[in-house]
């Protein structure tokens, strides 16, 4: 009878840990996916800002080149 109780407790503990590991893995994957999306959006915005900055600098340099 004691062996049966120990087996039952062990099985219950294993199921609890398995469930916790599954939830942890899912949460981790979701967080990584969210970070990947955010990193991509930031990269796109950085590229747009760089292009805008280059355009402004080009216009500024062209204006400086005009001599009266």
UniProtKB/Swiss-Prot annotation:
GO cellular component entries: extracellular region; pilus
UniProt keyword annotations, A-Z: Fimbrium, Secreted, Virulence
Biased composition, class Low complexity, residue ranges: 1-20
Compositionally biased residues, Polar residues: 21-44
Source species, domain of life: Bacteria
Compartment(s) where it occurs, according to its Swiss-Prot or TrEMBL record: Secreted; Fimbrium
Protein family per UniProt: Belongs to the HrpA type 2 family.
Protein name: Hrp pili protein HrpA
Upper taxonomic lineage: Bacteria, Pseudomonadati, Pseudomonadota, Gammaproteobacteria, Enterobacterales
């Amino acid at each position: 009878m004691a062996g049966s109780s120990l087996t039952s407790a062990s099985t219950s503990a294993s199921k609890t840990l398995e469930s916790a590991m599954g939830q942890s893995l899912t949460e981790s994957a979701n967080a990584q996916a969210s970070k990947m999306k955010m990193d991509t959006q930031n990269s796109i915005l950085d590229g747009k800002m760089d292009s805008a900055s280059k355009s402004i600098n080009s216009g500024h340099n062209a204006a400086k080149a005009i001599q009266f």
